[in-house]
Amino acid sequence: MTGVSHFSRVSKRVAALNPPHLRAIFSPYGWTDMYRDLYYHGGIFNHGFMSHWVKSNGPHFRTRNTLKEKWGEARYGQAIKAALGDPEISAVPYLVDALSHPDDGANSMLVDIIVNNLCNEFHRERSVNFENCKIPAYFGGDWGLYGLHLPGDIRAIEKWKGPKKLTIGPPVYLDRPLYQYAYESLRWFDHWLKGIDTGILEEPPIHLFIVGANEWRGAEEWPLPETKWTPFYLHAGGLLSEHEFWPQDGSSSYEDSPHHHGEIEFKTPPLVENTEICGPIVLNLFGSTTAMEILWFVSLWHFDAKGHGSLLTRGWLRGSQRKLDPAASRPWQPFHQHTEREPLEPNKIYEFNIEVRPYGIQLKQGERIGIKIKSADNDPANNYLELVGIGHVSSDSASTVTIQHNADYASHLLLPITKGNRIGTFISGGNLPPVKRP
């Protein structure tokens, strides 16, 4: 079996059943967790992709209303009524129209996702079950599809139990039918279907394209074994550095409302050496809000020596769904339960562990890494890949959001440093102190 996107997801789900006549799959670009990868990023509903996809199929595209059949008219109607009463949903006209006309076109697909806003059986039964998957599998993607397929293929390489390979390429949109992977797929299938020695299993199981260096590197496992997990702490004045805190550090705030979405930016000093960042990323924040809910939208940026910024990847988290699954979480990879919402107490400080989707980049001397934090994704997209990562709901009420960064609450960005910073030189900024002459 082979294919990308929907076909990749189907291939993975079929292969996970270990059918005796399936020899191998070549299935890059395919999400594996319907809730986390696609529709509810960090528990925040992402309607942008689904709305675009439904519209692109035309007005005559229809789907069977399986959820209505399963639940019955009464329960289905109550769920729709509750969704229409959610201010985040009712603020989006397209979603209101779909909920008001659930039997029109493909609206039932959208309604099913809206009314199942927690990670429940609806999402799990449509995701990949990794418990006993032994079929040889080839996964892949690119750094730019962080809002759709990237996390699914990385999860697959970690959890798949049979022979496996992974290729993560540069952030570009590949042409259909993905002819760029044709030669690699032939090598994979020639080995498993024809017994031809193509040499593909003698190569490292993982190949990653490093942006900036513009070259490929091999790896034996994910995350990379040589990773130096380095915390970069948030400071007053928008500084991001390895220094844990200074006496003057306190907190930073921004205002958020339907009419104005404020933000805070933190950047490192210019790096003093070429530095490679490759792997999972997490932002551990201590923060509060004047409201009972907060939506965290985090973006990771690269700034060149002239100060021009480029978006790399994003992370999200609904504050009321901050509860972690301790067994599935790692320091570099928080895994949230998303099974219930626990409203926040206004002005109370909470810890939020925000997964930022992985990336691989080499930063040159004099360049910077930075983050932007806000409570909406209203910034326009520059390309299709960025477009897939936006389109979420936002809060309907005004609030003040405060981020703590001090000795008591050391908010920090945990970065996977795979080259450079051997003795911790980021903090100097590369500036030599001047000599005072008499």
Task: List each model region and its residues.
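Glycine-rich nucleophile elbow surrounding the catalytic serine of serine-hydrolase chemistry
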Residues: 3-13
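Accessory cap/linker subdomain of secreted extracellular hydrolases
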Residues: 16-18, 23-132
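Conserved alpha/beta-hydrolase "acid-adjacent" motif
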Residues: 146-152
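Short beta-strand immediately N-terminal to the catalytic nucleophile in serine-hydrolase-like folds
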Residues: 1-3, 28
